[in-house]
Amino acid sequence: MSSLVSISKKLSGQRQHRERSQPEARRKYGELEKKKDYKLRAEDYQKKRDTIKKLKKSAMDKNQDEYHHHMVNSETWADGRHFDKKTEAEETETQIQKKLGSLKDLEYVKFKLNEEKKKIDEMKGELHFADSSLNGKGNTHTVFVDTDSEAKSFDPRVYFDTTTSMLSRQFNRLKNEDFQNKTIIGAGTKEQVRKADRVRRTRYNELIKRVERAKELQVVVDKLELKKQLAAGSKSELKPQKVKKAKAMRAAVYKWTYERKK
């Protein structure tokens, strides 16, 4: 296209105006600024000039006693950086609770919670679950005797008819006759024992994670149920009173005033 333009100029006798190049003596200063470069530089300068002019005007017109809500909802660090304060909901919600915070997710969360509970019950039965740390409280075995002398002379090895090494077991506790009359079937080598222990630890770790996940899903269900109840009673004149604030692993507690049904 440019060749056609140049041909048309030649035919019409129009003079070609070429841009002047940098003289050889000033070659060290680089190429001369072209018109397109000047236009970009001028537009950038004018844009910055207008922006500074607007900012100066807004600063002159600003009221010193002006109030804005963001002044209360933000803070400034020692290095001068600004940041927004977290709201109460953001401080008391985990990542999962934020993702499943809609009432539409209530039935889905209930379904996943039931699945987790079923899986936990299956794993407890499979692993002969007896870890008190996951139950939240320690297990105790109380034995009642008739007299104080029996309590003082009480020997758990005699009572349970087992050895000292078996007393700490809360399940599958072998008796003395089992050691005498039966052959205890176990692993043949130390490597098999270590392998079985690794498998057992892996299963217990999975169980611990599932218990924690079930606890968090239960909290999500509680918070969604509370949100549903608050939304249902939003048109009522008797508003519920908050008794306890919500936490990351606990829903808020509200107290409703009894409303007589018509």
From Swiss-Prot:
Entry's Gene Ontology cellular component terms: nucleolus; small-subunit processome
Keyword Kinase in record: no
TM stretches of this protein: none
GO BP, sorted A to Z: rRNA processing; translation
Cell compartment(s), UniProt: Nucleus, Nucleolus
Region feature (Disordered): 1-33, 56-80
Family label: Belongs to the UTP11 family.
Known function: Involved in nucleolar processing of pre-18S ribosomal RNA.
Name used for this protein in its record: Probable U3 small nucleolar RNA-associated protein 11
